[in-house]
Regions:
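Membrane-proximal cytoplasmic C-terminal regulatory module of class A 7TM GPCRs
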Residues: 276-286, 290, 315-333
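Interfacial loop-to-helix transition and helix-capping segments at the boundaries
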Residues: 11-24, 90-106, 144-161, 196-232, ...
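Alpha-helical transmembrane segments and terminal signal-anchor/GPI-anchor hydrophobic tails
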Residues: 175-262, 268-299
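Transmembrane alpha-helical segments and their boundary/interface "anchor" motifs
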Residues: 17-25, 31, 35-99, 110, ...
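Hydrophobic membrane-embedded alpha-helices
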Residues: 51-82, 86-87, 91, 110, ...
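Specific transmembrane alpha-helix
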Residues: 23-38, 103-118, 141-177, 221-244, ...
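Alpha-helical transmembrane segments of integral membrane proteins
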Residues: 43-51, 102, 129-132, 153, ...
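Alpha-helical transmembrane segments of multi-pass membrane proteins
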Residues: 1-4, 64-65, 199, 268-271
């Protein structure tokens, strides 16, 4: 958790954190784009939930076995003793209800709502669908007006992304004509600068930022902007002719992208991020030069991503997918 302090350096740190929501937004948008015309399938929901359950409970069971022979790492010892152990068990075996993975939980709820959203969209005119997007846009920034009322949560976030993806799918031709790449890139830069400025003023504890309630909103920032940036990025990428991309590159991208759920489940596990970054900090030392710090941080992130991708691939192939197929074959014949 970042400590809120005044200054541009702190504002930049929070900007990096907020930019993580761009990837989340793109995932929700992709879901709406591809599922708007699809029929409801229980299998899709079960597969998502079961993968989350396998990673969450499997991590806990693995640590229990290791703990029988070796001492737990210092960073997770508090989670495995006393009253905290009960919460750890609940988080590991009931991840959906405990909120262990907010993104996956929101995604599952979005899938459950998808058939109703699709029916609603079909009954609405294009103007009404646009009005619905405007309504959700307002909900995302409502908290920034005096900081007292918010109707924005993980589910509304997921549904908003779904609605955007569905709107793009249904109006793809018109969007391609009206939304040019250069203005969208300029919009991304402009919104990024506004996010940075917001973080600076929100952390300054000025009378205006305090009166508007911004001092308590620096972590989430302007929630609408990462969604808008994610929308622009999705539209720009969708225009790329992937037939011209070398087969090796496209195959690698597809292979890595198939493990993104697993990477998230490993890293965001209550044990995962603690153990991972504890050992990364032990083996990696921060250089004195700022430039070298940035370069080394970049390579550390890439290496961690690739390592987690390989681990997730192994877990999925050896355990998750075979178990999922057997359960579905038995119960959903």
């Amino acid at each position: 958790m970042l400590i809120q302090e005044p200054g541009w350096t702190n504002a930049l740190k929070f900007l990096i954190v907020q930019y993580g929501q761009v990837g989340v937004s793109i995932f929700f948008i992709i879901s709406g784009y591809f599922l708007v015309d699809k029929t409801f399938k229980r299998r899709r929901i079960f597969k998502t939930w079961f993968q989350m359950f396998c990673y969450s409970s499997g991590f806990f069971i693995t640590l229990l076995i290791i703990g029988a022979f070796y001492k737990y790492p210092t960073v997770i010892q508090p989670l495995m003793q006393g009253s905290e152990l009960f919460r750890t068990i609940a988080a590991s075996f009931f991840p959906f209800f405990y909120g262990s993975y907010w993104f996956i939980s929101a995604y599952i709820l979005m899938l459950l709502c998808a058939p109703f959203i699709n029916s609603l969209r079909q009954s609405l005119s294009k103007r009404a669908n646009l009005s619905l997007l405007v309504l959700f846009s307002f909900l995302s920034i409502q908290i920034l007006i005096f900081g007292r009322v918010s109707n924005w949560n993980n589910l509304t976030y997921a549904i908003f992304g779904y609605l955007i993806g569905a709107f793009i799918k249904k109006n793809n031709t018109e969007i391609s004509k009206r939304m040019r790449t250069a203005p969208m890139l300029a919009g991304i830069v402009f919104m990024t600068l506004l996010m940075l400025l917001f973080n600076y003023f929100a952390s300054s504890s000025s009378p205006i930022s305090s009166a508007l309630g911004w001092t308590n909103q620096i972590h989430n920032g302007i929630a609408l902007f990462p969604i808008a940036i994610g929308t622009f990025v999705f539209i720009i990428i969708s225009r790329i002719n992937f037939d011209r991309v070398p087969e090796l590159v496209s195959g690698t991208i597809v292979g890595i992208s198939s493990t993104t759920f697993g990477i998230y489940l490993l890293h965001e596990n209550i044990f995962g991020f603690r153990i991972l970054w504890e050992y990364v900090s032990k083996f990696c030392y921060a250089p004195d030069s700022l430039l070298l710090r940035i370069v080394s941080a970049f390579f550390i992130v890439i290496i961690v991503f690739l390592v987690l991708s390989c681990i997730a691939k192994i877990i999925d192939i050896l355990f998750v997918h075979p178990l999922t197929d057997k359960i579905l074959a038995y119960f959903m014949k």
